[in-house]
Design a protein with these regions (language model features):
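Bacterial lipoprotein signal-peptidase II cleavage site
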Residues: 53-67
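An extracytoplasmic/periplasmic, membrane-proximal ligand-sensing/linker region
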Residues: 73, 83-84, 199-231, 263-265, ...
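Periplasmic-binding protein-like
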Residues: 151-157, 244-292
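A conserved helix-loop-strand patch within extracytoplasmic ligand-binding domains
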Residues: 143-190
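N-terminal secretory signal peptides
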Residues: 1-33, 40-51
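Short, well-ordered beta-strand elements
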Residues: 69-83, 100-105, 181-185, 285
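Ligand-binding cleft/hinge of the Venus flytrap
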Residues: 90-98, 181-211
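Ligand-binding pocket segment of bilobal, Venus flytrap-like solute-binding proteins
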Residues: 116, 122-126, 196-258
Length: 332
C-alpha cells in the first residue's frame, strides 16, 4: 500500500531538470515584467524576477527556437497547484522525446505567471484556467498569449467540507460562522479562486460573518488535514480536478446561485509566437487531451504514488500504463 506523502514539502531537485530562479512577488504584481525593469530591482525586486531567465534564441521568447523539433522550451507553473505540476512533467517527457530541451520555471502567483508568459519570459503555461478563474488575467495579457489547446473539460471551483459535515450547499453556511470558527480557509491571495470567493460567493450567499483566510495551498491542506484528524468542522476553497478531493473525502458544496461560474476547460497556453517557433511541439500539443479518468490517474501517480523529486519517474510509469492516451511521438 502506498503511503500518502505531503506533495507541498520542499521538493529536492534529484533528477528533475535544472529549475530556474523561482519568482516570489506579491499578488499586486499584475503588470508585465520586463527583464530590464526586474533586473534593475525596481521596488526591491532585484534578483528575484523572471529577468534572470534571459533569452537564449532567435525566437524572442524564453527559449527561442525557430527550427522544427529543436530549441529550448521553458515551462512556467505553480508547483503547489498539482494540475500544473503533473502536466509540466508530462510535457517535459513528451517534448524531450521530440528533441526539445525543457527547462522549468516554478512561480508562486498566477498573475505573475501570466505576465511572464505575455512577456515571453516563459514559453508555456502547461495547465491554465483562462475561461473563468483567470479571465481577468486573460483580459490583461491575452493579446500576447497563444491558446494551444483545451486539454481537459469540466474543471470547477468550489467550497468544500469533509464528508462528515452535515451540509450540502453553500447557502446552508449562512448563519453558521461560529460553527466553523468564522473562517473559510483559502489558498494564495492572488488566485482566481480567492477572487471569486471574496468578490462573488461571500456577498452572494450572505457570508459576511466569515473571514476568508488566505495564505497558500500548502497551508490550507495542512489545516484541512489537522481538522479532519480531529473531526472538526472546516470549510475550505477547493477545485476539481484536484487530488485532495478524493484523498480527504471532501464534499463540494452545491452552488445554486452559480457564483463560482460555469465549469471550464483547462488549457495549455503558450507565449506569442510559440507555434511559429516550435511547430512540432504546437502540432503535438494541439492533439494532447485527457479525460477525467486519465487526468485523475496522472495526478494521482505524480502526487501520491511516487516520492518527492520523482515526478519524472511518475510520468514514465503513467505513460507505461497508458501507452495509447496521447498522440505518438515520431521515432519512438
Amino acid at each position: 500500500m502506498t503511503t500518502r506523502r505531503d506533495p507541498f514539502a520542499p521538493r529536492p531537485r534529484g533528477a528533475r531538470p535544472a529549475a530556474r530562479s523561482s519568482l516570489t512577488l506579491p499578488p499586486s504584481a499584475r503588470r508585465p515584467l520586463t527583464r530590464r525593469s526586474a533586473m534593475l530591482g525596481a521596488a526591491g525586486l532585484m534578483g528575484l524576477g523572471l529577468a534572470a531567465c534571459g533569452s537564449s534564441g532567435d525566437g524572442g521568447g524564453a527559449g527561442g527556437g525557430g527550427e522544427s523539433g529543436g530549441g529550448t522550451i521553458t515551462l512556467g507553473y505553480i508547483p503547489s497547484w498539482t494540475d500544473g505540476l503533473s502536466t509540466a512533467y508530462l510535457m517535459d517527457n513528451r517534448l524531450t522525446a521530440m528533441g526539445y530541451t525543457v527547462e522549468h520555471e516554478p512561480i508562486t502567483e498566477a498573475g505573475v505567471l501570466y505576465a511572464g508568459l505575455a512577456q515571453g519570459d516563459v514559453d508555456m503555461f502547461p495547465s491554465a484556467w483562462p475561461e473563468v478563474t483567470h479571465a481577468s488575467y486573460m483580459e490583461e495579457y491575452g493579446d500576447s498569449i497563444e491558446d494551444l489547446v483545451a486539454y481537459y473539460e469540466g474543471a470547477v471551483l468550489n467550497l468544500s467540507v469533509p464528508e462528515y459535515v452535515d451540509i450540502t450547499s453553500i447557502d446552508e453556511l449562512a448563519g453558521q460562522a461560529d460553527r466553523f470558527g468564522g473562517r473559510i480557509v483559502g489558498i494564495e491571495p492572488g488566485a482566481g479562486l480567492t477572487e471569486a470567493t471574496q468578490d462573488r460567493v461571500i456577498p452572494g450567499y450572505g457570508l459576511e460573518d466569515f473571514e476568508l483566510v488566505t495564505s497558500s495551498t500548502t497551508a490550507m491542506i495542512t489545516e484541512l488535514e489537522s481538522a479532519i484528524d480531529a473531526e472538526e468542522d472546516i470549510v475550505v476553497t477547493l477545485w476539481s480536478p484536484f487530488w485532495a478531493m478524493p484523498v480527504y473525502s471532501m464534499k463540494a458544496l452545491e452552488d445554486p446561485e452559480g457564483h463560482f461560474g460555469e465549469p471550464e476547460a483547462l488549457h495549455h497556453l503558450g507565449r506569442e509566437g510559440f507555434a511559429e517557433d516550435f511547430p512540432d511541439a504546437a502540432e503535438w500539443i494541439a492533439q494532447a487531451t485527457l479525460s477525467d479518468e486519465q487526468f485523475g490517474s496522472l495526478e494521482d501517480m505524480v502526487v501520491n504514488q511516487f516520492d518527492e523529486g520523482e515526478e519524472a519517474e511518475a510520468v514514465e510509469a503513467w505513460l507505461e500504463e497508458n501507452p495509447d492516451v496521447l498522440p505518438p511521438v515520431e521515432g519512438e
